[in-house]
Amino acid sequence: MGIQAAEISAILKDQIKNFGQEAEVAEIGRVLSVGDGIARVYGLDNVQAGEMVEFPGGIMGMALNLENDNVGVVIFGSDRDIKEGDTVKRTNSIVDVPQGDELLGRVVDGLGNPIDGKGPINAKLRGVADVKAPGIIPRKSVHEPMATGLKAVDSMIPIGRGQRELIIGDRQTGKTAIALDTILNQKSYNDAAGDDESKKLYCVYVAIGQKRSTVAQLVKKLEENGAMEYSIVVAATASDPAPMQFLAPYAATAMAEYFRDNGRHALIIYDDLSKQAVAYRQMSLLLRRPPGREAYPGDVFYLHSRLLERSAKLNEDFGAGSLTALPVIETQGGDVSAFIPTNVISITDGQIFLETELFYQGIRPAVNTGLSVSRVGSSAQTKAMSSVAGPVKLSLAQYREMAAFAQFGSDLDAATQQLLNRGARLTELMKQPQYSPLTNAEIVCVIFAGTNGYLDKVALADVGRWEAGLLQHLRGKHAELLAWITNEDPKIKDDAAGRVKAALDEYAATFA
């Protein structure tokens, strides 16, 4: 077979023409030492603070300490396969996460990777995890209600869209239960809103340092109640490395900010920030940053303030969206004056204080109504609710004061006796089983009944039964009254009070 020169030259010409001249340039460094999830890297001279770097085997890390002769990198994953002398590559990108509606109904880790086995998330947008909070100009004061469906909270500690309300208490006092009920309560509002995005509320739940079984149970509960369709769960569990637990709240906030910045409304629950602070303390000490009070680093206040300041109500010029935050803090033995609790109390717009004592007395949710406050929520309360909630606060405050004195004296005058009786019944009325949130109108009617003496003759043990019967009666025979309160939002006095009283009188006559 002869050599065909023309054909060979044609092939050579073709190859020369298509010769790629691009050379891939990557800035690399070498691992000096590695251990406890921290790598010291030499040679990454131009790396930025907070930049992602890549180790062999695709393990990612984040540059946190930029020192004269080396870079301190925290590792998102196991450091077992990283050894001294390994090459580390810059990625030239600050830590970012996927954003958008594609995340709804999914469970992701602290970097936005799916961990629910439902395939990849094809998000079109990505956002930087740790961005600056909105300034003063884009904001507006909180004025729309964010209903939790809990009688004790919606009446006495109202929360508005764009508010930060801390849920604080010892372990096993029902902190997560309040947060979960709030998510479940949005189902009826979101379904009623139809296509009106301004009425819907999307929920993001961040589990920080919790057991995997606990997170799985929570996701199952959300799925059973049809709440996953408007929720995102971000999980950095106890078995995840500290950097993941530190990063998860920021990543989740970036996902929630997508809704805030597009004129929609979102709620984010951080469960819980005590564990994030512990993870950050671990990272800081291993990076040899100087410890401060309780061995936390000096910037632990900034850790939480820059996170919670991202929750805001934006004004009309910026789309009128909002991001509401419910951070959870676990106290040790009811000590609210510890470092982290005092920090977060000073950052937030109020707190729901839960007590072990009340929990064991069977008062659940175990809200201490005396210590709990909402600093901005009252302006977001519906007219109907604020008109019935005032007397409750007063009655319960007087009851707590009198109950303390009543232990000493046996012969009490009729007025004091009446005050104690009503206070006991109102306390009983504030109890609510888990996973059974009520609508705004139902809470208004129940509380109106309590403050207007409908329960004074009912035995204390029968209050729960009386309330359950009333709700059934209202839903069955007075659905139009509930709809009227929901849609018109009247102040419950004069004519409106007359309509509610008529329904209550009708029920009271049948109760036995």
UniProtKB/Swiss-Prot annotation:
Reaction equations catalysed: ATP + H2O + 4 H(+)(in) = ADP + phosphate + 5 H(+)(out)
GO molecular function: ADP binding; ATP binding; proton-transporting ATP synthase activity, rotational mechanism
Positions marked as site (Required for activity): 372
EC nos: 7.1.2.2
GO cellular component, one term: proton-transporting ATP synthase complex
Keywords: ATP synthesis, ATP-binding, Cell inner membrane, Cell membrane, CF(1), Hydrogen ion transport, Ion transport, Membrane, Nucleotide-binding, Translocase, Transport
Protein's cellular compartments: Cell inner membrane
Binding site for ATP: 169-176
Subunit structure and binding partners: F-type ATPases have 2 components, CF(1) - the catalytic core - and CF(0) - the membrane proton channel. CF(1) has five subunits: alpha(3), beta(3), gamma(1), delta(1), epsilon(1). CF(0) has three main subunits: a(1), b(2) and c(9-12). The alpha and beta chains form an alternating ring which encloses part of the gamma chain. CF(1) is attached to CF(0) by a central stalk formed by the gamma and epsilon chains, while a peripheral stalk is formed by the delta and b chains.
Family affiliation: Belongs to the ATPase alpha/beta chains family.
NCBIfam families with a match to the protein in the record: atpA, PRK13343.1
Role played: Produces ATP from ADP in the presence of a proton gradient across the membrane. The alpha chain is a regulatory subunit.
Protein name: ATP synthase subunit alpha
